[in-house]
């Protein structure tokens, strides 16, 4: 498999794709080993799921992949879209990415990525933050990838991005998680611009909102109001906790201490 096709697969597995290798019984013949990738997305990302199925089909030499609607979540109460595809190559991919049975970030795997693969990784696991001042102006932005890994792995990822693309990521920790699953990466406004330049050409139209924070900080346009403070009635330009403006929220915090 050539490097471009492999990078597409690696990026999808780093994101929401899951590879399972298991033995399946057959009544009249010897059991066979199933090597399958499953991708699942919520109802609002149907187009994205279909887009990924087409790109994976290309990577696998035109293998037909059908996206189906399924029930998901507790009690099967939620709609979702998924595809599952079997291919012998997934056995090798699993050995690279699931040493010991769990997904790990290694230099070998990272070196298999290209900008398109990174784009799928970000579209699945990435998010954006916007700092909006009291008058509705976006003053800065940041980009995060929820790697949720060990500190050592997060440092490896950050060092790799710096060496390969000149993009600087900071290591962040979610203290609610165990140390081996607590760390993720984030970059500031200037590095967000650099990152968007790398992945932007590979982001489908249905997922452009994942880079909207870059456009907002570039446009120098005031954001539209999203509501009013439930305490003082001040106009809000971003959703705040408990529907309060920053001043009222701070007052509430001090009152509770």
Task: For every predicted segment, state its role.
Residues 240-251:
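Cysteine-rich micro-motifs
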Residues 251-257:
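Short metal-binding segments enriched for Cys and/or His
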